[in-house]
């Protein structure tokens, strides 16, 4: 599976439940969010803008994913919103890995270029180094409508946070055959 095939399988609305362990504080917290994922074509203005931000030829981009989220964490009960464009630039010698350009980072809210690897098991692993932190995030499908995500963030050479997230795809509200039969009998 290519990174764009992974993004295409991820397209849609997701309900997310996250548990984060803040190792320095010896504390864990839960969080919930809604996430919307859409694929973007290589010619999309957002893709071109991110490529230009990193001085990468936009013709090297194979597309992108736009991820938008809205959620809250138990620790501070603040609402978290965000919107990020992820632009993969495959390695010409091995398209299963490459650069991942982001207009906003995960651990630090700045534009960042990291790397990605598509595993033979279909999992996407993202590696990102920031000025003060580095993160590793692995995302995989347990089923077509269930994604799992595990991540670690290191600060100053030591682990500072580990997270696990389950993401369930929100399906359309079409009536099931059983409820349709029950509804027709009540008429």
Swiss-Prot record:
<dbReference type="InterPro" id="IPR012674">
    <property type="entry name" value="Calycin"/>
</dbReference>
<dbReference type="Pfam" id="PF09367">
    <property type="entry name" value="CpeS"/>
</dbReference>
<comment type="similarity">
    <text>Belongs to the CpcS/CpeS biliprotein lyase family.</text>
</comment>
<dbReference type="GO" id="GO:0016829">
    <property type="term" value="F:lyase activity"/>
</dbReference>
<protein>
    <recommendedName>
        <fullName>Chromophore lyase CpcS/CpeS 2</fullName>
        <ecNumber>4.-.-.-</ecNumber>
    </recommendedName>
</protein>
<dbReference type="InterPro" id="IPR018536">
    <property type="entry name" value="CpcS/CpeS"/>
</dbReference>
<comment type="function">
    <text>Covalently attaches a chromophore to Cys residue(s) of phycobiliproteins.</text>
</comment>
<keyword id="KW-0456">Lyase</keyword>
């Amino acid at each position: 599976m290519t990174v764009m095939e992974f993004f295409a399988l991820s397209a849609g609305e997701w309900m997310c439940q996250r548990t984060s362990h803040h190792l320095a504080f010896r504390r864990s917290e839960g969080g919930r969010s809604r996430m919307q994922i859409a694929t973007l074509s290589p010619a999309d203005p957002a893709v071109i803008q991110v490529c230009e931000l990193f001085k990468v030829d936009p013709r090297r981009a194979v597309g992108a994913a736009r991820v938008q989220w809205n959620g809250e964490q138990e620790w501070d009960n603040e609402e978290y919103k965000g919107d990020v464009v992820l632009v993969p630039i495959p390695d010409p010698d091995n398209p299963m890995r490459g650069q991942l350009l982001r207009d906003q980072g995960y651990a630090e809210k700045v534009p960042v270029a990291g790397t990605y690897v598509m595993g033979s098991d279909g999992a996407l692993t993202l590696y990102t180094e920031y000025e003060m932190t580095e993160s590793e995030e692995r995302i995989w499908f347990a089923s077509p409508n269930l994604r799992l995500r595990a991540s670690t963030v290191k600060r100053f050479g030591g682990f500072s946070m580990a997270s696990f997230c389950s993401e369930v795809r929100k399906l359309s509200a079409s009536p099931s055959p059983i409820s349709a039969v029950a509804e027709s009998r009540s008429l």
